[in-house]
Amino acid sequence: TFKVTLNTPTGQSVIDVEDDEYILDAAEEAGLSLPYSCRAGACSSCAGKVTAGEVDQSDESFLDDDQMDEGYVLTCIAYPTSDLTIDTHQEEALI
């Protein structure tokens, strides 16, 4: 289990996420309302930016290598591989 800190427009939340659980799903289970659309890694609605830690988002098909290198993540298909911090609601930054 990893500690995932989510920095949202309304404040900060820390949730526990299993290494085989998508970050978006865990956030919803914790009662948080994060943006999403396709839930398949094919759009940018759920995009966040990792500011600390690592994720596995090998199922994504939307972000390019430069965006991933900059830390962008699709929370609907991202698994934590360490404790991490994500700034949520980053779709506008990608467009």
From Swiss-Prot:
Q: Which CDD domains match?
A: fer2
> Cellular component terms, GO, for this chain's entry?
chloroplast
Instruction: List localization entries.
Output: Plastid, Chloroplast
The residues listed in the UniProt record as binding [2Fe-2S] cluster, with positions renumbered to this chain, are C38, C43, C46, C76
Q: Which domain of life is it from?
A: Eukaryota
- An example Gene Ontology molecular-function term: electron transfer activity
Alphabetically ordered keywords of this record: 2Fe-2S, Chloroplast, Electron transport, Iron, Iron-sulfur, Metal-binding, Plastid, Transport
What's an example GO BP annotation here? electron transport chain
Q: Which cofactors does it use? A: [2Fe-2S] cluster
> Where is this protein chiefly located?
plastid
Domain (2Fe-2S ferredoxin-type): residue spans on this chain: 2-92
The UniProt entry, under NCBIfam families, shows:
fdx_plant (TIGR02008)
Protein's job: Ferredoxins are iron-sulfur proteins that transfer electrons in a wide variety of metabolic reactions.
Q: What is this protein called?
A: Ferredoxin
> What organism is the protein native to?
Marchantia polymorpha
